[in-house]
Amino acid sequence: MNKTKLTSWGNNREKEVVFTDIPEHGTINVGNQNSYGDCFFPKNANAFKNRELQDINYKFNSSMTMDDLITKNRIGLYGVPGKRNVTLGGAIASDTHGKDNIWGGSFARNIKDIYIQLPNNEKLVVSRDKDFDIFQSTIGGYGLTGSILGCSFIDDLPKYSNFYNKSIITGNSLEELLSKIKFQNKVFTVCWIDLLSNKKDWVIENFEENLNINKP
């Protein structure tokens, strides 16, 4: 069997593994390896990489990417990470956040229920109303509760525009930066601070919906 080198985000660890479609004891789920943190490595030489779900009618399976969801399915989501090929399973497992996290929260806000296979091979649908402990531990649990196979989303998802105005604010004191962030009410906000500078120079980029453009 062909082995693939699995590395951590910081490339400080690596291991050769065989990707399998069948979750087994000792394996661990792998998405597209876009986590900003150094995630877990499988105990043995196998890593589970789910490609398709054949046994359920869940529209959103764990191998779908943010690009599949947003671009192809036109779904608005909270807490969208900064890379388009992050998998849905990975976004749930790490409970991602995005440039909307000041008001939108994390990826957990999107999730209605999760279809999961436990280490004993039992398959469950867990939610805030059913098996809440497993549901809560799975979101942000990096797959340690079991294999995330799919999910469904809440009905009240955000609706985003195709057109935004960008504004840029600059300054050079932390006090001013914090006051500016506190009173921002934008859809997306990005901030950089130059910590190597004695002046603590900073930049804020804000994005808000452009209501003057006719939407297609």
Where are these regions (language model features)?
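Glycine-rich N-terminal segment of FAD-binding domains in flavoprotein oxidoreductases
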Residues: 2-85, 91-100, 191
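"Short basic amphipathic alpha-helical interaction patches in structured regions
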Residues: 73-74, 104, 128-132
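Structural signature of FAD isoalloxazine-binding scaffolds in flavoprotein oxidoreductases
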Residues: 20, 37-54, 100-121, 147-154
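A short, structural micro-pattern
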Residues: 42, 80, 86, 108-110, ...
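Helix N-cap and loop-to-helix transition residues
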Residues: 49, 65, 87, 131, ...
